[in-house]
Regions:
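Residue-level signature of outer-membrane beta-barrel architecture
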Residues: 60-64, 91-93, 132, 146, ...
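Outer-membrane beta-barrel initiation region
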Residues: 28-63, 172-177
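Outer-membrane beta-barrel "beta-signal"
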Residues: 54, 157-180
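Hydrophobic, lipid-facing positions within transmembrane beta-strands of outer-membrane proteins
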Residues: 38, 52-58, 69-71, 83-89, ...
Length: 180
């Protein structure tokens, strides 16, 4: 019971904090709704401990808005054959038309391969990404994420990743939004 309360508590704290931070900033940029994105990322996995693995990600970031939140889904893999499929919510916080901070929260299924044992197949990921927004709305950024099982198991080492991200508007790839 304590584990579920702990997870719920931190999810609520994250979402309320993101809402409080993003709502006033987002409203000032509401006239320019963002497109959906295909994000590719490459970087270091388990950077706090070993930094002995490379991580690659592919994400779809929807343009559907649920208040200030936008859903996303993705897949991550490492050269250790660890894999993680996930979905969650994110918030765009615009500090200017070019500078975007994007906190996100996701939950998904993890398979360790020959990589790090994170103690449970269910993993939660929190991430902060700081990106530069180009004229065509594509973004290049740096992200820092933490992934752990939030004490669903007594083995809860967690891991961190530092990633270089490039998000391209989906309509530039497919010629239209995925929802059209």
């Amino acid at each position: 019971m304590f584990k579920q309360q702990f997870i719920f508590h931190w999810c609520v704290v994250f979402l309320i904090s993101a809402l409080v931070i993003a709502l006033p900033v987002r409203i000032s940029h509401a006239e320019s709704a963002e497109p959906d994105f295909l994000n590719v990322a490459l970087g270091g996995y388990d950077v706090h401990d070993d930094w002995n693995a490379v991580e690659a990600r592919l994400e779809y970031r929807s343009n559907m808005e649920l208040s200030v939140f936008r859903p996303f889904t993705g897949f991550m893999t490492t050269n250790d054959r660890s894999m993680y499929g996930y979905g969650g919510v994110l918030v765009d916080v615009f500090f200017s038309p070019r500078i975007v901070l994007q906190p996100s929260l996701a939950v998904g299924a993890y398979a360790k391969g020959s990589g790090k044992d994170l103690g449970h197949w269910i993993q939660f990921r929190t991430q902060l990404e700081l990106a530069w927004r180009f004229d065509d709305r594509s973004r290049a950024g740096l992200s820092l994420s933490h992934m752990s099982n939030a004490h669903l198991s007594s083995n809860n080492q967690g891991t961190e990743a530092v990633m270089l991200n490039y998000a391209v508007p989906f309509d530039r790839i497919a010629g239209k939004s995925i929802w059209e």
